[in-house]
């Protein structure tokens, strides 16, 4: 009897311990793990896992790139967005007459068979001695430059269509005057010579007035200084290199503060041409853009001078102005 009681008590204790062990294991599974406490002043080193990096990249692949591009790149307004020109003016290119603003520096049209141009054949008035230096003075200049050998000036308006030699006094003595250079047209060229081929390579320097309107006597806002080059064999293109000097504010016409420089090809046979803005000074420093150049024909008051006045209308579009 006593032995059976001991066995029963032993089995009861084993069963109780087993149940307690099973219950404690279930409770441990249900309790969430607590974060590890780090002593003050120590920073734990945590190595990122590859899975986290891949997840961060795959979730939003283009977000970081789009944000960086939008904040770093600033696109200025392009020429297509500019509906109105920032600046407009009219340039008067006056050739010949008593007050020319343009002068040819290269491109003499020579008829050597008639006029005896230097280096074509011997001339005692040009070469006083053998192997001498040619001396051009008021006594023999008309043997070198006369209406048939004058500088060929067709200007920015294109080649002349008439056959009249335009000068002031109607004779070749105009070549002696710096302010009244004559110019020749197609009817006065040597036989077999084409006007366009003789014009090719001619350089003309200019110091032209800029006005607010097309009339030559309108308000002057500045000057255009530079040169243009006959750059096509057919005579329809002029390569322009100009710096436009604008008057200062408050009607200070004796002060030229701001300037814009242009370079490009003006096609005289076209209604309008585009040339590039290559820089500037003053309020136009770092200027970029372009200008539309139009040749105006048969305007009122266009021929109030005794020279040939070619009017160019400039419309300037700037995409950046400091």
From Swiss-Prot:
Q: What's a Pfam family in this record?
A: Dirigent
Alphabetically list the UniProt keywords. Answer: Apoplast, Secreted, Signal
Q: Where in the cell is it found?
A: Secreted, Extracellular space, Apoplast
Principal localisation: secreted
Q: List the disulfide bonds.
A: none
GO cellular component terms, alphabetically, are: apoplast
Q: Which GO terms describe its biological process?
A: phenylpropanoid biosynthetic process
The protein's matches in InterPro entries, at most eight in alphabetical order, are given as:
Allene_oxi_cyc_Dirigent, Dirigent
The source's superkingdom equals: Eukaryota
Q: Which residues form the signal peptide?
A: 1-20
What is this protein's function per UniProt?
Dirigent proteins impart stereoselectivity on the phenoxy radical-coupling reaction, yielding optically active lignans from two molecules of coniferyl alcohol in the biosynthesis of lignans, flavonolignans, and alkaloids and thus plays a central role in plant secondary metabolism.
Subunit structure comment from the entry: Homodimer.
The record's comment on protein family reads: Belongs to the plant dirigent protein family.
The molecule here is called Dirigent protein 9
This protein's species is Arabidopsis thaliana (Mouse-ear cress)
- Taxonomically, what lineage is the organism? Eukaryota, Viridiplantae, Streptophyta, Embryophyta, Tracheophyta
